[in-house]
Amino acid sequence: MFEGKCLIVEGRSDKLQIEPILNENVTILRTNGTIGVHQLEELLDPYESCELFTFFDADTSGDKLRALMDRHYPEAEHLRTMPTYKEVETTPRKVLAMILLRAHFSIHNEYIL
């Protein structure tokens, strides 16, 4: 059984874009760009009992992070922004809200399309 949700994003701007949308307690962790296996394990070890989600950019860096997560945390669910927006931070909040809603996150009603 999971003890809460943990959402992993790339950077501070991604976190700031997503935080106001959520209507539940979610731990949001930042990789601060591309990281290695050791740093990833250090980041995620305290959250091993959480349900893991990733929300990385639709670019090469995001692809590398998704591949790293697949190898070491295959249970993590990957959320994806539309290639049109490319980055989480530039994706409109209402679009992010719909992606989060589909993944069973509770969101504030003002962001529902």
Annotate each language-model stretch with its function.
Residues G11-R12, A58:
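Helix N-cap/beta->alpha junction signal
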Residues D14-Q17:
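Short N-terminal binding/cap micro-motifs at the start of the first secondary-structure element
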